[in-house]
From Swiss-Prot:
Keywords: Amidation, Amphibian defense peptide, Secreted. Its main location: secreted. Expressed by the skin glands. It comes from Crinia signifera. The lineage of its organism: Eukaryota, Metazoa, Chordata, Craniata, Vertebrata. It comes from the Eukaryota. It is found in: Secreted. GO terms for cellular component: extracellular region. The modification Serine amide is found at residue 15. The keyword Isomerase does not apply. Signal peptide: none annotated. This is Signiferin-4.1. Inhibits the formation of NO by neuronal nitric oxide synthase.
Amino acid sequence: GFADLFGKVANLIKS
């Protein structure tokens, strides 16, 4: 879902 996608992107940016 969108939440999963957003979380994945956020994690990528955070890294």
